[in-house]
C-alpha cells in the first residue's frame, strides 16, 4: 500500500460539504478510533488521512448511512475499511460486516487491506476477514464462516448463493458497504443487491463508496438508505489531478502501428492498455508479443487462476504492460503505472474516469492517452464537457513530459 502521507489530497473546495457534521479531521489520532485500530492503520503505512478519509471516517463511525464519493487513488478503500472496523465488536466471532465488490479481484484486494488494518483488533483471529467470490468451492466458504469470520468481502452472486444456502448467517450484521456503488447498482447487479437486502437486518448501516455517483444512482439509494450523510464531489472537480490527458487522432486500421511507435519513443515504467472487447484484448496482446513487446492480458472470461497470476506478475513489476477490458478499471491498485492508454475509448463517461485513475495513483503523476477515430470525436467532446476538462492533442515532444 502506498504511503498515505504522499497523497495529494483533493482540494477542500472540491467537495460539496453541504451537510452538518462533515468537517475534515486532519489526523487519525484525532478521530474516535480504537487504539488497536490505530496501530493497524500506522503499521499498514498510513501516515495522514487523505481528503475522503478526513471527511468520511468519523461520520461512518457514528453508525448512520453514508454516501461517499472520491476520485480513484485517493483512499476510498482505506476510508471504509477503517470506518467498518471501528463499528465491529471483536469480542464476538459472528459475522458483523459485509463488503460487496463488483469483481473478484477488487474483493480480494479489499479483503487484504481490511485484514492488515484490522490485525491488532482481531488478536490472533487470522480468519476474521474472509472472501466469497466465484471460482471457489462452496465447501471452502462454509469452512470460512465456521472459523469465525467477522467480516465478509465478496461479489454479489456468490454472497447471494451462500446466503440462500443458509451458510452465511446475517442476523448479526451491523454494516453493509457497497464498493464501486455506481457499478453495484447498475442493471447487471441491482437485482442481486436487492436480493441480499431481503436477508439483512432492518437497522443495518449502509455505506456507499464510489469515484462516480450519477444522479440515477443517488435516486436509487432512497429505496434502502435512511437520511444518509452525503460526501460528494462537484462534477467540475472530477477530473483527476496529476494526470495529464491527451488524444491521438488515428483511424482504426492504424491504431496498432501508432501504439508500437509510442512504445519505441518513450520510456514507460508500467502501463495499462484498455480495449473494449475480450477479442480485441487477446488480439492486441498477441500482436504486441509478436513484435517483442512483452505484455500480459486479462479479461473476465479467463480462468480465475490465470487472472490472479497476471495481476500478481503485473503488481510485482515482472510484467510492465497489461492489456485488459474494463475488468481492472475499478480500483485495482498498482502503484507504478504511469501511462494509461485507451486503445478504444470507453463506452460511457464513468468508465473513463475509472480507467485513467489507474495512472498517477496516490499523488503520483500520470498520463492518459486516448486513441480517437473520426467517429470517436463526439464521445471525446462529451467526456470533456461532462468533466469540465480539456484533452489536448499529444505533443510531438511528449517523451519530455514523462520526465517532469
UniProtKB/Swiss-Prot annotation:
Coiled-coil residue windows: none
Catalytic activity: ATP + H2O = ADP + phosphate + H(+)
Binding annotation for ATP: 70-77
Top-level taxon: Eukaryota
Location of the Helicase ATP-binding domain: 57-231
Helicase C-terminal domain: residues covered: 242-402
Enzyme Commission no: 3.6.4.13
GO cellular component: cytosol
Keywords: ATP-binding, Helicase, Hydrolase, Initiation factor, Nucleotide-binding, Protein biosynthesis, RNA-binding
Entry's Gene Ontology molecular function annotations: ATP binding; ATP hydrolysis activity; RNA binding; RNA helicase activity; translation initiation factor activity
Residues spanned by motif DEAD box: 179-182
UniProt motif Q motif: location: 26-54
Membrane-crossing residue ranges in chain numbering: none
Start and end residues of each stretch annotated as Disordered: 1-28
Pfam families named among the record's database cross-references: DEAD, Helicase_C
Family: Belongs to the DEAD box helicase family. eIF4A subfamily.
Subunit architecture: eIF4F is a multi-subunit complex, the composition of which varies with external and internal environmental conditions. It is composed of at least EIF4A, EIF4E and EIF4G.
Task of the protein: ATP-dependent RNA helicase which is a subunit of the eIF4F complex involved in cap recognition and is required for mRNA binding to ribosome. In the current model of translation initiation, eIF4A unwinds RNA secondary structures in the 5'-UTR of mRNAs which is necessary to allow efficient binding of the small ribosomal subunit, and subsequent scanning for the initiator codon.
Identification of the protein by name: Probable eukaryotic initiation factor 4A
